[in-house]
């Protein structure tokens, strides 16, 4: 079964990796730590302070599952996950989330050149208009970072 984790006897360990989290609270806390490390504590705190009671459950889901389980897996380095996110968010044309993940990619060790190459590669497969928007957002963030240094 190539493509996902297996135990020594060849069985999939996907379900056990999710089930082995001792509690939702621990997974949520781990997710919050990873989320803050990748996106920056200030960004996460600001975002969560603005969450309505209606939207709070989806933020909890994202923190626990996305950050606490998926981003915490050993299969890919954080930099690789960040570059993949930039490509996927470009394909989905999600500028707001894309901007946060540009900062996250830099925090995870991606270079400006690697971000640029990821966006160029993405342009070919998802379309130039989507990539142009991502280049615009990334450029604005990179300029902002340069001006703050």
Predicted features along the sequence, with ranges:
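Residues at alpha-helix boundaries and the short loops/turns that link adjacent helices
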Residues: 38-41, 95, 109, 125
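Short alpha-helical scaffolding segments that buttress acidic/His motifs in well-ordered protein cores
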Residues: 62-66, 83-90, 118-123, 134
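Acidic, glycine/proline-rich low-complexity segments that act as flexible tails and inter-domain linkers
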Residues: 2-79, 107, 133-149
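Substrate/cofactor-recognition hotspot
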Residues: 128-129
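Short Asp/Glu-rich motifs
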Residues: 124-125, 142
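Mid-chain, well-packed structural core segment of small domains
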Residues: 83-86, 90-116
């Amino acid at each position: 079964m190539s493509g996902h984790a297996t135990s020594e006897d060849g069985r999939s360990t996907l379900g056990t990796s999710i089930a082995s989290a001792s509690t939702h609270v621990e997974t949520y806390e781990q997710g919050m730590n990873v989320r803050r490390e990748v996106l920056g504590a200030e960004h996460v705190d600001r975002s969560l302070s603005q969450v309505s009671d209606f939207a709070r459950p989806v933020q909890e889901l994202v923190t626990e599952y996305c950050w606490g389980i998926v981003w915490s897996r050993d299969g890919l380095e954080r930099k690789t996950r960040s570059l993949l996110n930039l490509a996927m968010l470009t394909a989905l044309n999600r500028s707001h989330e894309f901007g946060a993940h540009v900062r996250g990619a830099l925090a995870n060790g991606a270079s400006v050149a690697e971000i640029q190459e990821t966006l160029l590669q993405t342009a070919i497969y998802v379309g130039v208009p989507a990539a142009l928007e991502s280049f615009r957002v990334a450029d604005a963030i990179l300029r902002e970072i340069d001006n703050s240094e």
